[in-house]
Regions:
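A conserved mid-protein helix/loop that constitutes part of the nucleotide-sugar donor-binding site
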Residues: 16-21, 169, 178-193, 208-214, ...
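Short His-centered aromatic/hydrophobic patch
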Residues: 65-69, 86-93, 108
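Carbohydrate-associated surface elements
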Residues: 130, 149
Length: 351
């Protein structure tokens, strides 16, 4: 089977991570290509791709309307001639007039995304039930749900230990520094209110809110407790998540929450906002803790509870490791996509 993935950019994010994981799995038994439309991509992420994957880079400037970019896009699609054209940004299909020659699939990676061209796709997939509900509530056909996947076997497991009074309780948050979406400022405000010098927070990721979050850290006099580590490659993350006592994901908007699943796979207790998608991952509180989203008081309450009852949190994290392996392992997720592709091919051949 020939599978071509199409995405606007390849920087750090859940959609990009899924595309890489999916392509690397699929190339084991298929011919796989990846087309990146814009000139926004991370060489580190490209280096994670299997060498057998054919990469096409159009290098379009963001928001450009250069007709030559459209021509180049269609030339690459025609050249690869996929059985499956798997697109990860909805409106990209509008720029592929030769789309009718291929079976097109859209994966919707977040809530409230503009979905121009949605009805042109042969099949649509959402990365969570929450995203599927959000899509249906906008008057569009409900997409099938296939969760994002993680390589659970590649994630180093934590050594269970309860920090003593002299040790720092280490919190980690992983994601783009976009506080209006990911809510990192809530952690800073909660840390300030807790008034404990034995709690530290590491932010892993980069983004447009970096300067704002650094300034909030300075204003709250948290410089000795807060570290901004910048982007880290997936190998580093998978190796070091286990160094932390708690992963906090205080999202204000979230379509899935890949790093929540990664923390669970590492055996790290997790605390997430009570949005529908994160609650799916922690099985409505059976596999992790949650607080009212955008509520610093409730975040403080739950942080105090987890620190005080950390032995309970570790027991919960043991269950969560099994849960995430059974439900979100990348091999399982990738196979679900292969099954979806094969379903189309079978129907085509039996017409």
């Amino acid at each position: 089977m020939r599978i071509l993935h199409l995405i606007y950019s390849l920087n750090v994010g859940g959609a990009e991570r899924m595309v890489i994981t999916l392509a690397n799995y699929q190339v084991q038994s298929n011919q796989v290509g990846l087309c990146i439309i814009n000139n926004l991509y991370s060489q580190k992420l490209l280096n994670e791709l299997d060498s057998r994957i054919q990469v096409f880079r159009i290098n379009r400037k963001k928001a450009s309307r250069n007709i030559l970019d459209v021509f180049q896009l269609n030339r690459y699609v025609f050249k690869f001639h996929p059985d499956i054209l798997h697109i990860h940004d909805s409106d990209a299909i509008l720029y592929i007039p030769i789309r009718s020659f291929y079976h097109t699939i859209l994966t919707i990676h977040a809530m409230d995304l503009p979905l121009k061209g949605y009805k042109l796709y042969n099949q649509t997939v959402a990365i969570s039930k929450a995203v599927a509900d959000n899509t249906e509530n906008r008057g569009l056909c409900r997409p099938e749900v296939i969760y994002n996947g993680i390589s659970t076997s590649a994630i180093q497991r934590t050594k269970k230990n309860i920090p003593n009074a002299e040790q720092n309780f280490r919190i980690v948050q992983v994601g783009r520094l976009e506080h209006g979406i990911k809510g990192q400022h809530l952690i800073l405000k909660a840390l300030h209110r807790l008034s404990s010098s034995h709690i530290s927070v590491d932010f892993i990721g980069d983004g447009s809110s970096y300067n704002y979050l650094k300034e909030v850290t300075r204003q709250l006099k948290l410089e000795k407790q807060v570290n901004f580590l910048g982007n880290r490659d997936i190998e580093w993350i998978y190796h070091h998540l286990c160094d932390y006592h708690l992963l906090v994901q205080p999202s204000i908007s979230e379509g899935f929450g890949l790093t929540i699943a990664e923390g669970m796979a590492a055996g790290v207790p997790v605390l997430v906002s009570d949005l529908p998608a994160p609650l799916e991952i922690i099985d409505k509180g059976k596999q992790g803790y949650y607080f009212r989203h955008n509520d610093v008081d409730d975040l403080c309450r739950m942080l105090r509870y987890i620190i005080k009852h950390y032995e309970e949190a570790l027991q919960l994290s043991d269950k969560a490791q099994t849960f995430v392996t059974v439900n979100f392992d990348s091999k399982l997720i990738a196979q679900q996509y292969i099954n979806l592709y094969n379903e189309y091919i079978y129907k085509t051949h039996t017409k």
